[in-house]
Amino acid sequence: MPRPPAKTSLAAFAAFAALGLSACGDSHTKVTTGTYAGESGKNAPYLDVGPLSYEVQLSRELNPVNTEDSTYLQALTPAQRTLAPGQEWFAVFIQVYNHGSQPLPAASNLTITDTQGNTYLPIEPGEGNQYAYRATLVPGNGQLPLPNSVAYDGPTQGALLLFKIQVVSLDNRPLTLKIVDPTDPSETASAELDV
């Protein structure tokens, strides 16, 4: 004769649920390092730098004769536009989130470093480049790029950090993006970039 199904007590179920939820981790854990996971950005970490969170959407080489890529190279001065022998364009597209209610300054100190210690600073295009990352105030409960902006609605949905890097640095991977908090330089985060 079959046994009637056992009744699970509410207390046992609650204990089991609590155990399962405890495995999820603390959603407020500060993340300061990560690895960008590829073109989808699907597994890209949110990097906490001071009170703001940064996420790499995409990182890749740019081809100036490609139609899409040429738009990222708009509003450069002649000196900025010139690549030295052995250099190429490299782009990192990021989003910045402010979960607080007050506007906060976005980082202005962002660099890329290869495994040989070569460090690259971003080039800031002129105002005519609507994709360029600008270290402006991030609105309270807002983000950069701003919703409904060209960069936000663009193919990468991120603001452009534009670099001139040595081609040899692509052999000295991983490349690491470092972000420094503008209000407290001791607060930093870094992410390994996909190439």
Could you describe each region identified by the protein language model?
Residues 1-22:
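Sec-dependent bacterial lipoprotein signal peptides
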Residues 24-195:
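Conserved functional micro-motifs across diverse proteins
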